[in-house]
Amino acid sequence: MLFRSQITVFVGNYDFWYESSQLLIRQQKEANKKAEARAKELREFIARFSANAKRAKSATSRKKELEKLEITDIKPSSRKYPFVDFKFERELGADILKVEGLTKKGFFTDLTFTVKPEDKIGFISESGNTLSMLFDILTGKEEADGGSFKWGSTVIPAYMPQNYDEFFDGVDLTLVRWLDQYSRQHDEEYLRSWLGRMLFSKEEALKKAKVLSGGEKVRCMLAKMMLMQGNFLILDEPTNHLDLESITSLNKGLINFKGPLLLVSHDHELVQTTCSRIIDIEGGVKVYDKDISYDEYIDEQSK
């Protein structure tokens, strides 16, 4: 990886890279601090004794040491981070979401669970399609074969499906006009401000929605979710196609989100840092539901 203008190889996952890169920066800063202190000592010695015949040799030696002393210029990172911040105006009531006996043939049977205002739930399953179908049903994209679910009257869900191509394929709109479809305010500068948060500059905001890359589509979907000010987030594999900086920003945004959350993700760190309840659906049946962190859940399963 190109790190601080040098090629540095980090063997491991994203978490290992991030921790290692931050450690390198801290170590370099500490080395610089010591080098600067030593440089100060050398300059003081040289200034004091360079004119002293008896100490001239020592002063010359100090000058050579000072010339060789390296203080690395730690430049600010050039990496750009989107600004992900999910705010909402409508306060939540006590009733959020109640799912009873929900059934979809070929996916799951008799699913029952209740979401409380403080819940941030990580969903686990051997079948990602099962969880995608569940989220699609809860958001009205698909219909269940049996059972029921009921949203609280104060809830405004904001959903990022795993497959969002339908929002972009063949859509001959600029990003400004694309986002305008989901906004109550239609001022162009207002819309551009939301796109700017997701690193779409003035020119990039005029791109056509149909030509976006996978990562750009995700950033647009995040802009859409923030703009809609949903007080209940549902995200299905939101880190797909995102770069490291965008994943970091999304992670922080979800940690700071004050409403309930339903999340499916293969990103261990994302689930661990944002979710405080785990629901496991295997073979179409709910086999686990507990207020617990992801790491604690993994520890339980390994015993």
Regions found by a protein language model. Name each.
Residues 20-110:
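Flexible nucleotide-interacting loop at or near the entrance of a catalytic core
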